[in-house]
Design a protein with these regions (language model features):
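Conserved functional hotspots at enzyme active or ligand-binding sites that engage polyanionic ligands
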Residues: 1-25, 29-125
Protein backbone atom coordinates (compact mmCIF):
# COMPACT_ATOMS: atom_id res chain seq x y z
CA UNK A 1 0.00 0.00 0.00
CA UNK A 2 1.41 3.41 -0.99
CA UNK A 3 0.41 6.04 1.56
CA UNK A 4 0.65 9.73 0.64
CA UNK A 5 0.40 12.92 2.64
CA UNK A 6 -3.16 14.23 2.38
CA UNK A 7 -4.75 10.81 1.94
CA UNK A 8 -7.85 10.05 4.00
CA UNK A 9 -8.28 6.49 5.27
CA UNK A 10 -10.52 4.62 7.62
CA UNK A 11 -8.36 3.39 10.50
CA UNK A 12 -8.79 1.31 13.64
CA UNK A 13 -7.37 3.44 16.45
CA UNK A 14 -8.16 1.21 19.44
CA UNK A 15 -6.82 0.65 22.01
CA UNK A 16 -6.79 4.18 23.38
CA UNK A 17 -5.93 5.85 26.67
CA UNK A 18 -7.81 8.80 28.16
CA UNK A 19 -9.30 11.29 25.72
CA UNK A 20 -7.56 9.98 22.59
CA UNK A 21 -9.82 9.53 19.57
CA UNK A 22 -10.43 5.84 19.04
CA UNK A 23 -12.47 3.25 17.24
CA UNK A 24 -12.99 2.81 13.52
CA UNK A 25 -12.81 6.33 12.11
CA UNK A 26 -11.44 8.44 9.28
CA UNK A 27 -7.95 9.90 9.61
CA UNK A 28 -5.85 12.24 7.48
CA UNK A 29 -2.21 11.37 6.77
CA UNK A 30 -0.09 14.39 7.74
CA UNK A 31 3.40 12.88 7.58
CA UNK A 32 5.60 13.48 4.53
CA UNK A 33 5.76 10.86 1.78
CA UNK A 34 9.34 9.77 2.52
CA UNK A 35 8.46 9.01 6.13
CA UNK A 36 5.32 7.22 5.00
CA UNK A 37 7.39 4.96 2.77
CA UNK A 38 9.88 3.85 5.44
CA UNK A 39 8.24 3.99 8.86
CA UNK A 40 5.07 4.39 10.84
CA UNK A 41 2.84 7.30 9.84
CA UNK A 42 1.48 10.40 11.55
CA UNK A 43 -2.25 11.04 11.34
CA UNK A 44 -4.84 13.57 12.44
CA UNK A 45 -8.20 12.30 13.62
CA UNK A 46 -11.44 13.32 11.95
CA UNK A 47 -14.89 13.87 13.43
CA UNK A 48 -18.19 13.90 11.60
CA UNK A 49 -20.02 15.42 14.57
CA UNK A 50 -21.45 18.72 13.41
CA UNK A 51 -21.92 20.04 16.94
CA UNK A 52 -18.18 20.00 17.59
CA UNK A 53 -16.94 23.45 18.64
CA UNK A 54 -14.56 24.81 16.02
CA UNK A 55 -11.10 25.77 17.23
CA UNK A 56 -8.09 27.21 15.38
CA UNK A 57 -6.80 23.62 15.21
CA UNK A 58 -9.87 22.44 13.29
CA UNK A 59 -10.20 22.33 9.50
CA UNK A 60 -13.66 21.75 8.03
CA UNK A 61 -13.80 19.63 4.87
CA UNK A 62 -16.65 19.10 2.41
CA UNK A 63 -16.35 16.20 -0.03
CA UNK A 64 -18.30 14.69 -2.86
CA UNK A 65 -17.72 11.03 -2.15
CA UNK A 66 -20.34 8.28 -2.22
CA UNK A 67 -19.09 6.13 0.66
CA UNK A 68 -18.16 8.84 3.14
CA UNK A 69 -19.94 11.58 5.13
CA UNK A 70 -19.83 14.69 3.00
CA UNK A 71 -18.75 17.02 5.81
CA UNK A 72 -16.17 16.42 8.50
CA UNK A 73 -13.64 18.24 10.65
CA UNK A 74 -9.93 17.41 10.80
CA UNK A 75 -8.78 17.88 14.41
CA UNK A 76 -5.12 18.88 14.43
CA UNK A 77 -5.04 18.78 18.22
CA UNK A 78 -5.61 15.01 17.86
CA UNK A 79 -2.43 13.85 16.11
CA UNK A 80 -0.63 10.59 16.73
CA UNK A 81 1.79 8.11 15.23
CA UNK A 82 0.30 4.81 14.16
CA UNK A 83 1.49 1.67 12.45
CA UNK A 84 0.33 1.52 8.84
CA UNK A 85 -1.42 -1.79 9.55
CA UNK A 86 -4.09 0.28 11.36
CA UNK A 87 -5.03 1.91 8.02
CA UNK A 88 -7.85 -0.07 6.44
CA UNK A 89 -9.74 1.54 3.57
CA UNK A 90 -8.62 4.44 1.36
CA UNK A 91 -11.28 7.14 1.03
CA UNK A 92 -9.78 10.03 -0.96
CA UNK A 93 -6.93 12.55 -1.18
CA UNK A 94 -7.41 16.13 0.00
CA UNK A 95 -6.57 19.03 -2.32
CA UNK A 96 -3.31 21.01 -2.00
CA UNK A 97 -5.36 24.04 -0.88
CA UNK A 98 -7.02 22.04 1.91
CA UNK A 99 -3.62 20.67 2.97
CA UNK A 100 -2.33 24.26 3.30
CA UNK A 101 -5.21 24.90 5.71
CA UNK A 102 -4.23 21.75 7.59
CA UNK A 103 -0.61 22.93 7.73
CA UNK A 104 -1.72 26.25 9.27
CA UNK A 105 -3.87 24.50 11.87
CA UNK A 106 -1.05 22.05 12.63
CA UNK A 107 1.34 24.97 13.16
CA UNK A 108 -1.14 26.48 15.62
CA UNK A 109 -1.48 23.16 17.44
CA UNK A 110 2.29 22.73 17.76
CA UNK A 111 3.09 26.40 18.40
CA UNK A 112 5.26 26.65 15.29
CA UNK A 113 5.92 29.99 13.63
CA UNK A 114 5.25 30.02 9.89
CA UNK A 115 7.58 32.00 7.63
CA UNK A 116 8.84 34.02 10.58
CA UNK A 117 5.34 35.18 11.51
CA UNK A 118 3.07 33.91 14.23
CA UNK A 119 -0.40 33.09 13.02
CA UNK A 120 -3.00 35.29 14.77
CA UNK A 121 -4.56 32.20 16.37
CA UNK A 122 -1.20 30.83 17.55
CA UNK A 123 -0.61 33.92 19.70
CA UNK A 124 -3.57 32.92 21.85
CA UNK A 125 -3.04 29.17 21.79
Amino acid sequence: MIIKRGDVYYAMLDPIIGSEQGGFRPVVIIQNDVGNRYSTTVIASVTTRKKKVYMPTHVPVKLRHDDFPHEFVVMLEQIRTIDKSRLLDYICTLSPAKMREIDRALAVSLGIKQCGKIDKFAKNA
